[in-house]
């Protein structure tokens, strides 16, 4: 199969999109990097009628690791530790001790006026995670294409899925 050109215009745009894919958590889908089609796919774990979302037979793909909830939680703690305003940090720490800490943290950060700093922090960290994953899995973006060393890729086969 002939590989297509990447829809990503730069290495940075690919890393940013990969970072988003790594941070999306859905128990019903896996994220794949399709090297043949040059895109990121969210693939249903169960058979569905949405077959167009699946890689084509013979496509070269690699499963994209997810950022765990614990890793994301730890980033909230690190962000709080970086804030020097003693009036804000207790409010953010309290938000981490409720039943739904991620939503509570976002709400507390919004009310404290640090939500933009949080999102900048989070974007930088997620992009670093994406770069690390790329390095560990032999993935790069060169000459307008996503390339791989082949050590971690596999050829998609419907026989493997059924």
Model-found features: residue ranges?
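Amphipathic protein-protein interaction modules
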Residues: 72-131
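Long, highly charged low-complexity segments enriched in Glu/Asp and Lys/Arg with interspersed Ser/Thr
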Residues: 120, 124-162
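The feature represents the first ordered module of a protein
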Residues: 11-97
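Short N-terminal edge-element motif at the start of the domain
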Residues: 1-8
């Amino acid at each position: 199969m002939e590989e297509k050109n990447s829809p990503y215009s730069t290495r940075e745009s690919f890393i940013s999109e990969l970072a988003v894919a790594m941070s999306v958590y859905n128990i019903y889908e896996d994220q794949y990097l399709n090297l043949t089609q040059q895109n990121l796919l969210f693939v249903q774990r169960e058979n569905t009628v949405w077959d167009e979302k699946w890689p084509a037979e013979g496509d070269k793909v690699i499963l994209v690791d997810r950022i765990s909830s614990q890793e994301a939680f730890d980033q909230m703690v690190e962000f709080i530790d970086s804030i020097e305003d003693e009036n804000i940090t207790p409010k953010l720490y309290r938000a981490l001790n409720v039943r739904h800490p991620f939503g509570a943290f976002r709400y507390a950060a919004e009310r404290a006026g640090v939500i933009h700093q949080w999102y900048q922090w989070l974007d930088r960290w997620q992009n670093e995670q994406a770069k690390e994953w790329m390095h560990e899995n032999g993935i790069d973006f060169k000459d307008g294409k996503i390339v791989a060393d082949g050590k971690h890729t596999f050829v998609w086969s419907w026989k493997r899925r059924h």
